[in-house]
């Protein structure tokens, strides 16, 4: 049956995924803690913007075209989460004012790319389904996931590109 112009068809979105290892690393950047509603209202994007303004002040940056957006569970019973905007460093010799250093353990990750024009929710649904289909589950860690953002991308872009990395273990 033909569809009218008012009906929308569901577009298939593919996010090819794979398993990768990431060695432990040290990072320096900014910390944010808040609710999912605050994050949805843009407070993380504002923090990312502040981070990018201060990026050049971080010594010993490991060369990369990306910065990390790392999310952790908040304290038990809390209504939100903790998010860091950081860059990997070769060593911590000095920490710029208002920033901190963070140690990220060596973990196994499921990885996929979210591209412009895709639904962010669908990208996360796709990688979650892929993890299950491969016989993995989310790892029991405080770190829930991280995203790799291009340094040249505007944090306020309504159509961002980034890489999703979710810690996993065999089910």
Where are these regions (language model features)?
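A solvent-exposed interaction/effector surface
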Residues: 1-171
